[in-house]
Regions:
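Extreme N-terminal starter segment of soluble prokaryotic enzymes
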Residues: 1-4
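Conserved N-proximal alpha/beta basic substrate-recognition cap immediately N-terminal to
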Residues: 9-111
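Short acidic-glycine loop/turn motifs at beta-strand connectors
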Residues: 36-37, 161-165, 218-220
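Hydrophobic, aromatic-enriched interface-forming segments
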Residues: 98, 107-109, 113-136, 143
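A short linear hydrophobic-aromatic micro-motif
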Residues: 113, 146-148, 210-213
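Protein kinase-like catalytic core scaffold
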Residues: 125, 167, 211, 223-225
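Phosphate-binding site of ATP-dependent enzymes
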Residues: 125, 129-206
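C-terminal active-site "lid" helix and adjoining low-complexity regulatory extension at the edge
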Residues: 190, 204, 208, 217-255
């Protein structure tokens, strides 16, 4: 049996994982699924040895209809077969940032003051879309309902959890959203064990066994922001000399 990697090598996150997997399926490949006979074909050849898989949709190139549909074809195939995959029981089809904030709060993680509205009476706030995909900006007024959240000034921290393993990092930047800062850098850091256990409990509640949780840290401590279910990791992996990508591959065997 074989461990498969699905994505495209123009995605640096897939490229760094490529050496650790037995076989690779390009997201733009010719993929067919004969549902009547229940046979999956890749480039005309039947797949008979698919035991586990890591999947990532390529956001570094245009998402053509073929690539879009290939991703969901494979997702549906994996879901209906005994194939090991991270977050396989995570069935939410829509973004659940707001739901996750409520669960995090229930578990004792501190969250910033948060409203979903078009205008807040609070000042010193930031705006971000409910569905994600856009960068965070300052403000308290939007033209449609957005997340309007207390602005926390401090350190950006990220905690990766892969089954029972974890890796903690800080993104060093002077920008509100580090994605707007080409000079941002990543360093290894520490997050206290109490917070780590709460995040693991949160992920268990969400049926996740792989993800990255983002925090801000100020003089009062850590503030939970969100959990990403398919995060980018290549810049972080470099700081631990490939240990993150190796863990992603190895922990597939422990699900």
């Amino acid at each position: 049996m074989s461990a498969y990697l699905f994505g495209q090598l123009s995605d640096p996150n897939i490229k760094v994982l490529h050496p650790y997997f037995d076989k690779f399926i390009d997201q733009a490949a010719n993929i067919e699924w004969d549902i009547t006979k229940d046979i999956l074909y890749i480039e005309g050849e039947p797949v008979t040895d698919l035991d586990s898989i890591f999947m990532r949709s390529n956001v570094f190139e245009e998402n053509t209809p073929k690539k879009y549909n290939n991703y969901y074809l494979m997702s549906n195939y994996i879901q209906s077969h005994k194939v090991v995959k991270y977050n396989k029981k995570y069935h939410y089809e829509t973004v659940t940032k707001l739901h996750n904030l409520i669960i995090a709060k229930q578990l004792g993680l501190r969250i910033p003051h948060t409203e979903v509205t078009e205008k807040s009476n609070r000042t010193d706030t930031i705006l971000k879309p409910v569905t994600g995909g856009q960068h965070t900006i300052e403000g308290n007024t939007a033209v449609y309902p957005c997340i309007i959240q207390q602005k926390i000034t401090g350190k950006n921290k990220r905690l990766y959890v892969i089954n029972d393993k974890h890796f903690a990092f800080e993104v060093v930047t002077d920008k509100l959203d580090y994605r707007d800062d080409p000079a941002s850098s990543v360093i290894v850091t520490e997050i206290d064990n109490v917070t780590i256990e709460k995040v693991k409990h949160l992920m268990h509640r969400l049926n996740l066994n792989f993800g990255a949780s983002d925090f801000m840290e100020d003089e009062e401590g850590l503030w939970y922001l969100e959990t990403n279910t398919n995060p980018m990791f290549v810049a972080f992996d470099k700081q631990v000399e490939g240990k993150l990508s190796k863990a992603i591959r190895q922990e597939l065997n422990n699900i």
